[in-house]
Amino acid sequence: MQKQAELYRGKAKTVYSTENPDLLVLEFRNDTSAGDGARIEQFDRKGMVNNKFNYFIMSKLAEAGIPTQMERLLSDTECLVKKLDMVPVECVVRNRAAGSLVKRLGIEEGIELNPPLFDLFLKNDAMHDPMVNESYCETFGWVSKENLARMKELTYKANDVLKKRFDDAGLILVDFKLEFGLYKGEVVLGDEFSPDGSRLWDKETLEKMDKDRFRQSLGGLIEAYEAVARRLGVQLD
C-alpha cells in the first residue's frame, strides 16, 4: 500500500491518502511538542518507537474486543489505518491526579482516583483544548448521545485492559487520552496510544516515563519511551 497525497500534518504525525479511499497511511515523525505546539523539538527514533508502541497497544485492545482503526505496520514509522470520520472530542481517563486536574482543583499530584475520572476535551489547539461535557456535545452536535456513551464505555474498557498490562510491567497508568471516529457508522478507536498521550510512572520510584519529561525539561525522553516499550514487550528493533 503506497501513500499518496498528504491530507493532514499534525504536531507529531502526518496522514496520507492511499489508492483505497477507506484506508490511510499514518506516519509518526520525530517531532515532540508542548504547549499546544508552541515548543517543538526533534528526537531521534521517536517516530519509530511511537509507531511500534501504538501498533502493540492497538493490537492488545483489539484482542480485548475494542474496535480500532489499525490495519497493519507498513514500516518503522508508518502504519495502515482505516479512514474514520473523527469525533472532535477527546476522552481522558484519570487513575491518579496529575496535569491539569492538579492545577484545576489544587489537589496533590499522585493521589489515587477511585473510581477513575472521565473527562471530555474539545480538540482545538487555538483554544487550548477546553474541557467540555456531554451536554456540550449534544447541543453543538459534535457527537450523538448514543455514540458518546459508546466512546465512554470503550474508554473505560481500554483502561481496565491497559491498567493491568502496565501494572504487570511495573508501571502506573496515571492517565491517558483516546480519540474516536466513525467507520461505516460504528464507533472505532483512532489516532494513537503512546507515551505522548498518556502519563506513565515507574511503580517503585514514581519516575515519570512519558512526555512530561519533555514538558518539564527532565531530559531522557527517548530513553524513557524505550524503557516503557521494552517492559511491555514491544519489539523495537
Swiss-Prot record:
Database matches in InterPro entries: SAICAR_synt/ADE2_N, SAICAR_synt_PurC, SAICAR_synth, SAICAR_synthetase, SAICAR_synthetase_CS
The organism's place on the tree of life at top rank: Bacteria
EC number: 6.3.2.6
Pfam families given in the database record: SAICAR_synt (PF01259)
Entry keywords, A to Z: ATP-binding, Ligase, Nucleotide-binding, Purine biosynthesis
Top enzyme category: ligase
Keyword ATP-binding attached: yes
Listed GO biological process terms: 'de novo' IMP biosynthetic process; cobalamin biosynthetic process
Record field: catalytic activity: 5-amino-1-(5-phospho-D-ribosyl)imidazole-4-carboxylate + L-aspartate + ATP = (2S)-2-[5-amino-1-(5-phospho-beta-D-ribosyl)imidazole-4-carboxamido]succinate + ADP + phosphate + 2 H(+)
Gene Ontology molecular function: ATP binding; phosphoribosylaminoimidazolesuccinocarboxamide synthase activity
GO cellular component, as recorded: cytosol
Keyword ATP-binding set for record: yes
Family, as annotated: Belongs to the SAICAR synthetase family.
Protein name: Phosphoribosylaminoimidazole-succinocarboxamide synthase
Organism per entry: Shigella boydii serotype 4 (strain Sb227)
Designated gene of the protein: purC
